[in-house]
From Swiss-Prot:
Residues 190-200 have a biased composition (Acidic residues). SUPFAM superfamilies: Ribosomal protein L25-like (SSF50715). NCBIfam families: bL25_bact_ctc (TIGR00731). Residues 185-218 are annotated as: Disordered. InterPro entries: Rbsml_bL25/Gln-tRNA_synth_N, Ribosomal_bL25/Gln-tRNA_synth, Ribosomal_bL25_b-dom, Ribosomal_bL25_C, Ribosomal_bL25_long, Ribosomal_L25_dom, Ribosomal_uL5_bac-type. CDD domains: Ribosomal_L25_TL5_CTC. Residues 203-212 have a biased composition (Basic and acidic residues). This is one of the proteins that binds to the 5S RNA in the ribosome where it forms part of the central protuberance. One of its GO terms (molecular function) is structural constituent of ribosome. The keyword Ribonucleoprotein applies. It comes from Roseiflexus castenholzii (strain DSM 13941 / HLO8). Keywords: Ribonucleoprotein, Ribosomal protein, RNA-binding, rRNA-binding. The keyword Zinc-finger does not apply. The lineage of its organism: Bacteria, Bacillati, Chloroflexota, Chloroflexia, Chloroflexales. This is Large ribosomal subunit protein bL25.
Length: 218
């Protein structure tokens, strides 16, 4: 049985620039939306949110308890981060109907070892890190596994259609899209200097300020 996650939220009246005060007091502003419901501005204890997000990610259901409302089943759908500290400064929850299929992005986890990669003859070229699937909310897996142990020749590759799906899950990403392939190690090494040259320029240091999206929140 999958772990159950819950969060207690409160309706939020503070919007715009004033939300900075909430963040300084350890409160994370958030929005709940979904099919058939009006967007709800809410706030949640930042530590509680971070603890749940670390375990649930964006593919596990979270039961939201909002004062004065019935509990809602939702996914953590989108995050806004501070451009310098990378702290989460806003979250979007996507409320769902448990009886209706949804389309979500699920991360791909590489498993096993290609004999050619293990011998040093090849390097792995991973094109996709996640794919879109359709399923009932309760059937959405935390991730999908990509077994590369069968990649024992350079002409072999793995496409989306080759991935094993749990019962009740179908593909939304086209099946002919490439997931992983092999490249000759020597060719990859020869290309590396050119790639390094393109990233040798130092990044410009921009003025530190809060993002416009934060200032115009809501």
């Amino acid at each position: 049985m999958s772990e159950k996650y819950t969060l207690s939220l409160e309706p939020r009246a503070v919007v715009g620039k004033k939300v900075k005060r909430l963040r300084r007091s350890g409160i994370l502003p958030a929005t709940v939306y979904g099919k058939g419901i009006e967007p709800i501005s809410v706030q949640v204890d930042a530590r509680s949110f971070n603890a749940v997000y670390r375990r649930a990610g964006r593919t596990a259901l979270v039961e939201l308890h909002i004062a004065g409302r019935q509990p809602l089943a939702a996914f953590i759908h989108a995050l806004q981060r501070h451009p310098v500290t990378r702290d989460i400064i806003h979250a979007d929850f996507r409320a769902v109907d448990l009886s209706q299929e949804v389309e979500v992005a699920v991360p791909l986890h590489i498993e096993g070892e290609s004999p050619l990669v293990e011998s040093g003859e090849a390097v792995l070229n991973q094109v996709l890190n996640a794919i879109e699937i359709r399923a009932l909310p309760s059937n959405i897996p935390a991730h999908l596994t990509v077994d590369i142990s069968g990649l024992d020749a350079f002409d072999k590759s793995i496409h989306v259609r080759d991935l094993a799906l749990p019962p009740g899950v179908t593909l939304a990403t086209p099946g002919d899209e490439l997931v992983v392939s092999l490249a000759h190690a020597r060719a990859a090494e020869e290309e590396a200097p050119a790639a390094e040259e393109t990233t040798a320029e130092p990044e410009l240091v921009r003025e530190r300020r809060e993002p416009r999206a934060e200032e115009e929140e809501e």
